[in-house]
Amino acid sequence: ISTKATFPMGKDVNAYGSSRFHLIEACENSLRRLNTDHIDVYHMHGFDGSTPVEETLRALDDLVTSGKVRYIACSNFSGWHLMKSLSIAEKYGWSKYISHQVYYSLLNREFEWELMPLGIDQKIGTMVWSPLASGRLSGKYRRNSAIPEKSRIAAGTSTVPKDAAPEERLYAIVDVLDEISRETDKSVAQIALNWLLQRPTVSSIIVGARTE
């Protein structure tokens, strides 16, 4: 069981962020909504620059000590955000982030520049979100073809910006995936996902699904 905190859950000033007040309240609310007595991995959805890192980590360590949270993780941190958090946790003997959730795909590989080496060095696992680049690597997007009408990109709700990479780069990648697909009898999406699962530090990928 995994869930997140930090992003707004209401309009009140204490209904968002990574302050001690909000994290403890958010955890209790999540436990109630999930109808469970513990959270296996509790993610900070983003770095809260308005709250001292010490306050955030102490609150999370208290949640771990209480048994309500087993492990803590973070999401969308920069390299210095993550390294500062790990350093402070080590200094005080508090629980450390065991995993970092990031955007990473064959189309966008910036994760490899800094965060992957950091993960290797500090033994931090990686959970990848949008591994198919908001569907761009699903096999539905083809050179000289229209964007699928019901796609998130067409609707403007994609978590990966439309200009995340030049179109020619996308189609060049898809062309190669098509070749491998024919050779292996696997889908373009399967190949793109399998590539990610073989990458250093990647322990899990998050695949979205339609609700229809």
Residue ranges and their predicted role:
Residues 31-52:
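Active-site groove signature of glycoside hydrolases
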Residues 21, 37-40, 54, 189:
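Residues in well-ordered alpha-helical elements
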Residues 17-35, 58, 82-87:
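Short, acidic/polar
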Residues 1-9, 100-102:
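A short, structured active-site edge motif that brings together acidic residues
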Residues 2, 41-43, 74:
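Outer-envelope exported proteins of Gram-negative bacteria
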Residues 51-212:
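Beta/alpha (TIM)-barrel catalytic core signal, keyed to glycine-rich beta->alpha loops juxtaposed to Asp/Glu
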Residues 9-24, 45-51:
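Active-site mouth loops of central-metabolism enzymes
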Residues 3-5, 38, 46, 130, ...:
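Short, small-residue-rich loop/turn micro-motifs
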